[in-house]
Amino acid sequence: MAAAPGARLLRAACASVAFRGLDCRRLLVCGTRAGPAVPQWTPSPHTLAEAGPGRPLSVSARARSSSEDKVTVHFKNRDGETLTTKGKVGDSLLDVVIENNLDIDGFGACEGTLACSTCHLIFEDHIYEKLDAITDEENDMLDLAFGLTNRSRLGCQVCLTKAMDNMTVRVPEAVADVRQSVDMSKNS
């Protein structure tokens, strides 16, 4: 059975609310309606102030980025092949992989909801040093990632900036999805 239209957006919104330390039930308080529509939720000014600055939902980042500012990103996949593509400033690296249909097996299995570590990437030192601070939630997921390094981050939590133009990120040789067993094969 297919998910109702907007279900992915609702899951992402729930993850964003949880990411900011708020109670996810606030999104679902209005209950279900007849038909496939997802309930509307409008945050109060207090809720917005409580949320504070944080990484926007990937969907919001795309909507906000009205200009076509793009940066080039090089992904070194598990086979050692370099996949070069462009992404919009403000999009997450997970968005870039999905929107450009890059051949990275199993990447982003949870669709950016911080429920797995399949979008684990390893950054160059000079780029890693400039990334926003890592959250406790992301750190918890990274603890379960295969091939963790001191320059590891989740692609769903890193948004592109102009300073990242022409960066190279490496995909670890194996994937550890906390929802499943570890996949040690390069081409599963």
UniProtKB/Swiss-Prot annotation:
One of its GO terms (cellular component) is mitochondrial crista. Residues 69-175 form the 2Fe-2S ferredoxin-type domain. The keyword Lipid metabolism applies. Its cofactor is [2Fe-2S] cluster. The modification N6-succinyllysine is found at K70, K162. GO terms for molecular function: 2 iron, 2 sulfur cluster binding; electron transfer activity; enzyme binding; iron ion binding. It comes from the Eukaryota. Residues 1-64 form a transit peptide. The modification Phosphoserine is found at S67, S181. InterPro entries: 2Fe-2S_ferredoxin-like_sf, 2Fe-2S_ferredoxin-type, Adrenodoxin-like, Adrenodoxin_Fe-S_BS, Beta-grasp_dom_sf. Keywords: 2Fe-2S, Acetylation, Cholesterol metabolism, Electron transport, Iron, Iron-sulfur, Lipid metabolism, Metal-binding, Mitochondrion, Phosphoprotein, Steroid metabolism, Steroidogenesis, Sterol metabolism, Transit peptide, Transport. This is Adrenodoxin, mitochondrial. It comes from Rattus norvegicus.
